[in-house]
């Protein structure tokens, strides 16, 4: 009887979530067939292009692309957030900001759009390798968040 109730609960939860339109986030969902990306730092630009390619959206030159994106600025900063009593860093804040504009083929540029992602993490000199790896993962997650936000805004534009 308990197994039946557990299965019934799980099934009803799945039905409820699917009925309300809930979807797990997956790859980039876009309503355009090709994109051109210029500007920005080489590492961010490369990551952005890779994410669009993984979603099946080809990267074209500006003359052939349906959407044209120009990254005006992408800036990553690392700020000390707090110190221990001895003056050692105990917490950092990571900020990643991207300013860009886009247009469809044969239309004027839209206004500049700035998006940002912030993360904080604790720091300990005793775990320097682990904390460096944590920082890399946080930065990668911030880039993914910014890229998904950009893709959503591009898809919602006419």
Predicted regions and their residues:
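C-terminal/domain-edge helix-coil "capping" segments
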Residues: 129-158
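C-terminal motif of bacterial Sec signal peptides marking the signal peptidase cleavage site
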Residues: 16-19
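Bacterial signal peptide processing site
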Residues: 21-24
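Sec/Tat-exported extracytoplasmic proteins
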Residues: 52, 56, 102, 106, ...
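N-terminal segment of the mature soluble domain
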Residues: 31-75
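Bacterial N-terminal signal peptides that target proteins for export
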Residues: 1-9
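Acidic/histidine-rich, surface-exposed loop or edge segments in extracytoplasmic proteins
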Residues: 29-35, 126-131
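Surface-exposed short loop/turn segments
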Residues: 70-114, 121-133, 148
């Amino acid at each position: 009887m308990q197994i039946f109730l557990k299965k019934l609960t799980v099934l009803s939860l799945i039905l409820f979530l699917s009925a309300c339109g809930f979807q797990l986030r997956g790859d980039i969902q876009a309503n355009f067939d090709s994109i051109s990306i210029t500007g920005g730092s080489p590492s961010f630009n490369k990551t952005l292009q890779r994410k669009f390619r993984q979603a099946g959206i080809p990267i074209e030159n500006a003359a052939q692309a349906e959407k044209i994106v120009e990254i005006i600025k992408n800036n990553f900063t690392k700020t000390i957030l707090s110190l221990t009593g001895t003056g050692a860093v105990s917490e950092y804040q990571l900020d990643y900001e991207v300013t860009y504009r886009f247009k469809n083929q044969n239309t004027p540029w839209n206004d500049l759009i700035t998006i940002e992602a912030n993360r904080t993490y604790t720091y300990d000199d005793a775990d320097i390798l682990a904390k460096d790896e944590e920082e890399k993962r946080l930065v990668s997650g911030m880039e993914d968040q910014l890229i998904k936000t950009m893709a959503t805004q591009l898809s919602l534009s006419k």
